Amino acid sequence: MSAILSTTSKSFLSRGSTRQCQNMQKALFALLNARHYSSASEQTLKERFAEIIPAKAEEIKKFKKEHGKTVIGEVLLEQAYGGMRGIKGLVWEGSVLDPEEGIRFRGRTIPEIQRELPKAEGSTEPLPEALFWLLLTGEIPTDAQVKALSADLAARSEIPEHVIQLLDSLPKDLHPMAQFSIAVTALESESKFAKAYAQGVSKKEYWSYTFEDSLDLLGKLPVIASKIYRNVFKDGKITSTDPNADYGKNLAQLLGYENKDFIDLMRLYLTIHSDHEGGNVSAHTTHLVGSALSSPYLSLAAGLNGLAGPLHGRANQEVLEWLFKLREEVKGDYSKETIEKYLWDTLNAGRVVPGYGHAVLRKTDPRYTAQREFALKHFPDYELFKLVSTIYEVAPGVLTKHGKTKNPWPNVDSHSGVLLQYYGLTEASFYTVLFGVARAIGVLPQLIIDRAVGAPIERPKSFSTEKYKELVKKIESKN
């Protein structure tokens, strides 16, 4: 029974044995009920993926054979020295980022995702697990399929005792993202892929074990994230996973929140932070490490370490710190004139305006827009939201006049912290952990696809500066 229970270990539950027994029974019932949903008339996610992947693998094989020698772009020297920005060199099936339009998940914009994906009863926000299904298969699941997937993820949420003890032993002043990466790495003990590979499983079966690891990991992430949050900022105790709740609701409740609107925020947050094509640090790192046939646990842990950087996922924490400093210095004067002066002072001091600009986007990030619309709906008069709104009115003009950015518009990090602050989740150093839970929803489907289509290990070519000089001299002498 332990393989299908969603309750976490007794060592950190605050409920008694009777409550735990009830949760065990609920988990069993929910999983059996989910299997009924899927077996009656609907395919499970694994069944559906197994059905469609042979044709996809053949499509890729044929495409490479017929067009493998086609030139798809050129590489400039400045790109080699500039973080490979803009170089076409990765395959990422789940999403594509358009500079003007923003992200599309399997061809769908964020507003389309918000309209079309299944939702929990009474909710207006899409279910993150429905997006996981879409990213993996390219198809929108039915309500019954999502309900079965929600129950499956809840049933996989139990955390090994050694991981709990490890988290409890970590110093509270260790950054939550470091703790998150440590815990995910420690879950390698549970890897079905690693065990199967050690036993010589056929390459054709790699994807199946990667799928199982990915769903196991996804099911455990809300518990790990919440345990870190409760250890560092609260009393260390968390409740158990609700076997009948969806992914976003379980995350909210494990963190200690029952507010209906906050639960909806978690659904939205996890959805829009999940995927942003494959070239960003966390997605690329997860894919890169996975290409060496490291398990999903080790691959995601590596991606989380990249996400923890201040130039990537930790930017939302830095935005909030900057907002607080701004608020303190302007002393309640949120006029456009005051904000504009503060922005110019920031830029003239050689600092950046956090939350503005993006490596690819050249318009307002639609993820920012989705969060802004949520705030307008739920708390239009909130002080911090009003401040962010004023900055939104002023900053693009200031940044354009400053002339040192290609994109003067806000990105996703410019808004997310304000939403969390409103609902009382004020510990900014934890925000990137939530980002990490969301990012798993985007990167794990690609790992499964990589193994299913036999993607090779990643190995680009590197040159030293001297070698590049030789190459440039040779090229220029021919022109």
Swiss-Prot record:
Major subcellular site: mitochondrion
GO molecular function: citrate (Si)-synthase activity; citrate synthase activity
Keywords: Mitochondrion, Phosphoprotein, Transferase, Transit peptide, Tricarboxylic acid cycle
Pfam families named in the record: Citrate_synt
Post-translational modification summary for this protein: Phosphorylation at Ser-462. Dephosphorylated at Ser-462 by PTC7.
PROSITE patterns: CITRATE_SYNTHASE
Pathways per UniProt: Carbohydrate metabolism; tricarboxylic acid cycle; isocitrate from oxaloacetate: step 1/2
Gene Ontology cellular-component terms listed: cytosol; mitochondrial intermembrane space; mitochondrial matrix; mitochondrion
Catalysed transformations (reactions): oxaloacetate + acetyl-CoA + H2O = citrate + CoA + H(+)
Cellular compartment(s): Mitochondrion matrix
Transit peptide location on this chain: 1-37
EC id: 2.3.3.1
Protein family per UniProt: Belongs to the citrate synthase family.
Name of the protein described by the UniProt record: Citrate synthase, mitochondrial
Gene name tied to this protein: CIT1
